[in-house]
Amino acid sequence: MQSKTLLAIGGAFSGVGVILGAFAAHGLKKMIDLPMVEVFQTGVHYQFIHAGAILLCGVLILLQTNTPSAQKCFSRAAICFIIGIFCFSGSLYALAMTGVKWFGPITPFGGLMFILGWVYFVVAALKINEVKS
């Protein structure tokens, strides 16, 4: 994935995270029970962490022009983080808002995608060729 695309996606997820966090803090508490607000806030928390990771992947892809294998792994990490946000955070948002329990089993898949993304991130970091001056 291109660096500019990842930077845009990471920025968008971050901005949406701010909106959802504010909604959870100010509006959602009037609509649903406190335990479900906490579920929603967990989704926001993980969205923020991984939006930042997507931004970092975008920057590192941009900086690693001399290491295509690292770029590829950072790109794969970011894709896993994107899928993880949709599945993990998205399922928590849906569960909190609707109370529909079948959203629950989607959450662990998103968590696995986060873990896989971090594995790719570590592999990418190990592939970085440091330029010596």
Model-derived segments and their meaning:
Residues 1-133:
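Polytopic transmembrane helical bundles with strong interfacial aromatic enrichment
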